């Protein structure tokens, strides 16, 4: 069954897979952590990213300690989706005991690249993105963690935003192209159309770095956006402080995907 977990609890799933794999492997386990956009320096204890702090801290609590019985190989796509295919090939060629990957696109590409290496993914709705056919029976070598209660949630977020900003006629959707053109974007477009609201882009394109965020938000402001919906992507989480600052600087009311944005002033 696909495991729907949050924060440090995901490490328990990873530790269980490591334990099962250890029956066939040496006492030293190799895990590849592959981030969509987070800097490699953040993929460690003390790196400042709350997700990896919880993840690696729980692994340590369960007895998996880097430098003792755990080797962690760290990779980042640096917000460049065009790099993902090359990154996937490199990681799979090194044949780690397990791959932990963030973002739906990366997890799907890993699934297509290997049927033997266990994959733990942090994704949006895994069924909607074609990672598994069923939550109850995902099959194959993929399990994971999803913070997405389903694409229908995006319609609800629009409802909440309209209550907070009742006169909003034009709403920006800040997300990268895969999400914009995929299930999330489709549901949100249908919801805005039904409400008589114009959904504004453009989507974020490679390389998804601070200049691209500034470009997209500037274009939304030029289109007279009344409010902003922030997509729940790994790339957005990497640049959450920048997103909050851009919304504040442009006096743009925003609805965010999780409380980490609120802690930064969103």
Question: What is each PLM-predicted segment?
Answer:
Residues 1-266:
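Short hydrophobic alpha-helices and adjacent helix-cap/hinge residues
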């Amino acid at each position: 069954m696909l495991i729907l977990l949050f924060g440090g609890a995901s490490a328990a799933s990873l530790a269980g897979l490591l334990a099962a794999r250890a029956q066939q492997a040496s006492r030293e386990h190799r895990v590849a952590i592959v981030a969509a956009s987070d800097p490699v320096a953040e993929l460690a204890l003390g790196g400042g990213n709350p997700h990896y702090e919880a993840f690696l801290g729980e692994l340590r609590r369960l007895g998996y300690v880097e430098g003792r019985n755990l080797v962690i190989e760290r990779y980042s796509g640096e917000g460049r989706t065009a790099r993902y295919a090359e990154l996937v090939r490199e990681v799979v060629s090194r044949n780690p005991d397990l791959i932990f990957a963030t973002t739906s696109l990366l997890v799907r590409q890993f699934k297509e690249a290997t049927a033997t290496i266990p994959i733990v993914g942090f994704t949006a709705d895994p069924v909607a993105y074609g990672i598994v056919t069923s939550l109850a029976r995902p099959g194959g070598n993929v399990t994971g963690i999803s913070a997405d209660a389903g694409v229908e949630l995006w319609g609800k977020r629009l409802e909440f935003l309209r209550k907070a900003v009742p006169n909003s006629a034009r709403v920006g959707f800040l997300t990268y192209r895969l999400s914009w053109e995929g299930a999330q974007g489709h549901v949100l477009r249908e919801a805005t159309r039904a409400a008589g609201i114009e959904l504004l882009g453009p989507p974020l394109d490679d390389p998804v770095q601070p200049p691209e965020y500034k470009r997209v938000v500037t274009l939304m402001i030029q289109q007279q956006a009344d409010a902003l919906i922030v997509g729940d992507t790994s790339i957005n989480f990497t640049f959450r402080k920048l997103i909050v600052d851009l919304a504040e600087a442009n006096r743009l009311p925003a609805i965010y995907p999780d409380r980490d944005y609120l802690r930064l002033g969103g």
